[in-house]
Structure formats: structure tokens, C-alpha cells
A protein has these predicted regions:
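Short acidic/polar mixed-charge low-complexity motifs
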Residues: 28-29, 58, 66, 82
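Short, surface-exposed charged micro-motifs
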Residues: 21, 50, 59, 67, ...
């Protein structure tokens, strides 16, 4: 059992929208990912999704027309079943996620960016 330097882990990869696992607890993975520009509209039928921004500003669009701004040090929890689309204003955002191990980052949508086997770093 060792501490994890999250910012150091972010320095180990450049891919965007490709979560990396840095830990697990209680049937969930602790994941980090870099986000830039717009992702796909999607939802997670059985899982809530927690976004915690370490660097930059994440914007989360919802189908009701709202956009929620998530700044450094802030958290947004998207309830299961709620369609959402994360995006940025062109900057690379460092994000941490807590999700059940079975959660696909693209939720109910399969696209070329869908990663079914996540890597540990």
C-alpha cells in the first residue's frame, strides 16, 4: 500500500478520452483521463458517474439544454440514466473518475474511442 501521486500518473500518457486505472476499491476503479474538445452523447444505464477535475475546466452538456461548468477541484456526479456529453473549450482537462469496474466510458454508445480493456498505470 503506497500513496499515489495523481499528477505524476497524468504525466505518463498523452491519449485523450482513454481512461487509465490507478486503483480500485469496493468493486470500483479509480480512473484518470485527459479530455479535450467534445465527446459523444451517452448515458450509463446502471451506474452513476463521478467527475473530479484536477486541471482545467470541464463542461457537461445535458439534453435539457443545461451546461454545467466543473472547475479545478470541483466534482460533478451524473446520475445513472442521464444522457450527457462532456467537452472542453479546446484545453486538455485532467479528470478523475470513480466508477464500477463494469462501466464503459462511452456508456450505451460504441464508437472507435470505446475502450473495453483498460490499462493500469
Amino acid at each position: 500500500m503506497d500513496s499515489i501521486n495523481i499528477m505524476e500518473k497524468f504525466s505518463l500518457f498523452n491519449e485523450q478520452w482513454t481512461p487509465k486505472i490507478i486503483g480500485e476499491l469496493n468493486g470500483q476503479y479509480v480512473k484518470i483521463c485527459k479530455l479535450k474538445d467534445a465527446f459523444v452523447w451517452h448515458s450509463h444505464e446502471n451506474e452513476d458517474e463521478l467527475f473530479m477535475v484536477f486541471k482545467g475546466t470541464l463542461l457537461m452538456d445535458f439534453r435539457d439544454g443545461r451546461t454545467v461548468r466543473v472547475s479545478e477541484g470541483e466534482v460533478l456526479i451524473v446520475p445513472k440514466g442521464v444522457e450527457h456529453r462532456p467537452h472542453t473549450n479546446g484545453e486538455i482537462v485532467f479528470n478523475l473518475l470513480f466508477e464500477p469496474k463494469s462501466t464503459l466510458h462511452t456508456g450505451n454508445v460504441e464508437i472507435p474511442l470505446t475502450v473495453k480493456k483498460l490499462n493500469w498505470i
